[in-house]
């Protein structure tokens, strides 16, 4: 057997390959002309893991490409020990695993600023080391980092975006981590409520420009949209984005979630020329390329005729943290406990946790199989992975994934400019077949190839 670690990366099959009978990996749907690994030649636990996460009938999976063998071999212990398992036996995979991120780089030494509605000092950012190097509350300047420990509704969004990018997965033994789990973060609260205006974002960018050297800010993530379509030629917010880029700060923006609307508008700051506007990928919680589709993300051309988004990244089934000390956290903890409890203990667990979930309170007198159905339904409805994490969706989470890859690239090659990073991400992206180019730009980011290209330019 060819050693797993020496196999080269397979490529995505073309129409010509398929027509010619090219072999396609049953797990990732990539093509590789010669380098396949027989599952029977792998350790039994690795065989079971690969079969459990292969689409379709697992018994039909007899061999996989070297890329998949390496990927699951690297992550085997983590998946078996820490990944949540779904009812079909497959696992809730992490973002780095699904996108095959390069584990050699963690964003160490790179600072990402997040502009959002609110934040929380989540353990995935603060344990074992606190990587929140600064917090700024623009509407309430007197409030410091200690005020973050009082969570409110506005805390959710920014907590999730920052952790999706830079969380180290401390509450999952490192499994549900971001692609840049060692990056430093600056958290900038833009508004008192969830509504964020053009002026709020502009104020945030101006703060970043004024403080970029003190905190060595290299990337700004903006998972928020402005008020309306505007030309970048006379829009102050777009001009601020251009100023950031000229100052050496990469600006990454969520393109929005209006792809289902007739005009599917792209608004500032995502419509600014130099930013990386990120659209949405639906990968169905799988590494199988054949299962990839588009999310309902907004798309251009912009009012100025610019192609937006430039790239797409996972925007559904994205593991993100649950805000601690909230009713949602209590509900998730109870659902996980019930899901893992033996049948004879279900009624007692519900009685011991009154008031957490009214539907569960009402189910305490039902038969066990009925309670199991309610638990499964609740876990699905609430997108619960476990007591600490849940699924989220939206391009608000695609953008921080791209920001985290950019942090890896800067760690690999600190001399990269914002335009270099954008060019590399575009040139290494992979287009989805059978989907409009306008919707996806240059396609799905490929973190591993992007980092390799960044290294090659150093």
Residue ranges and their predicted role:
Residues 230-232, 255-273, 280-308, 319-371, ...:
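Active-site-adjacent substrate-recognition loops and nearby beta-strands
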Residues 29, 66-69:
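Cys/His-coordinated zinc-binding microdomains
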Residues 7-57:
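Short recognition patches in nucleic-acid-associated and regulatory proteins
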Residues 190-274, 284-285, 303-306, 383-399, ...:
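Substrate-binding/access-modulating region of protease and related hydrolase catalytic domains
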């Amino acid at each position: 057997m060819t050693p797993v670690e020496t196999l080269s990366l397979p490529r995505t099959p073309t129409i010509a390959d398929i027509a010619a009978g090219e072999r396609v990996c049953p797990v990732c749907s990539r093509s590789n002309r010669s380098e396949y690994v027989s599952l029977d030649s792998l350790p039994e636990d690795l065989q079971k893991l690969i079969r459990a996460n292969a689409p379709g009938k697992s018994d039909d999976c007899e061999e996989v490409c070297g890329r998949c063998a390496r990927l699951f071999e690297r992550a085997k212990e983590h998946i078996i020990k820490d990944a949540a398992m779904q009812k079909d036996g497959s696992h809730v995979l992490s973002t780095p695993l699904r996108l095959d991120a390069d584990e050699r780089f963690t964003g160490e030494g790179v600072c990402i600023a997040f502009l959002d509605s609110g934040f929380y000092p989540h353990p995935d950012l603060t344990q074992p080391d606190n990587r929140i190097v600064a917090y700024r509350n623009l509407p309430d300047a007197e409030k410091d980092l200690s005020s973050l420990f009082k969570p409110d509704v506005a805390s959710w969004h920014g907590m999730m975006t920052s952790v999706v990018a830079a969380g180290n997965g401390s509450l999952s033994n490192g499994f549900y981590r971001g692609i840049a789990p060692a990056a430093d973060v600056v958290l900038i609260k833009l508004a008192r409520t969830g509504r964020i205006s053009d002026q709020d974002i502009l104020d945030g960018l101006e703060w970043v420009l004024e403080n970029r050297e003190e905190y060595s800010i290299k990337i700004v993530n903006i998972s928020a949209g402005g008020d309306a379509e505007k030309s970048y030629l006379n829009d102050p917010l777009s001009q601020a984005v251009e100023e950031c880029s000229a100052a050496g700060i990469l600006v990454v923006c969520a393109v929005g979630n209006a792809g289902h609307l007739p005009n599917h508008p792209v608004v500032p700051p995502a419509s600014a020329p130099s930013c990386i506007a990120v659209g949405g990928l639906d990968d169905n919680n799988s590494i199988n390329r054949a299962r990839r589709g588009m999310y309902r993300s907004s798309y251009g051309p912009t009012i100025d005729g610019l192609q937006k988004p430039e790239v797409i990244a996972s925007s559904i089934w994205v593991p993100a943290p649950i805000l601690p000390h909230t009713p949602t956290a209590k509900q998730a903890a109870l659902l996980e406990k019930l899901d893992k409890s033996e049948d004879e203990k279900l009624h007692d667990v519900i009685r011991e946790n009154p008031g957490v979930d009214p539907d569960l309170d009402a189910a305490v007198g039902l038969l066990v199989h009925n309670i199991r159905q309610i638990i499964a339904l609740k876990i699905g409805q609430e997108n619960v992975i476990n007591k600490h994490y849940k699924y989220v969706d939206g391009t608000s989470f695609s953008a921080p994934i791209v920001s985290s890859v950019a942090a890896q690239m800067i760690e690999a090659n600190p001399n990269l400019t914002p335009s270099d990073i954008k060019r590399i991400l575009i040139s290494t992206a992979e287009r989805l077949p059978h989907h409009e180019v306008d919707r996806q730009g240059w396609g799905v980011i490929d973190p591993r190839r992007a980092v390799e290209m960044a290294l090659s330019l150093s």
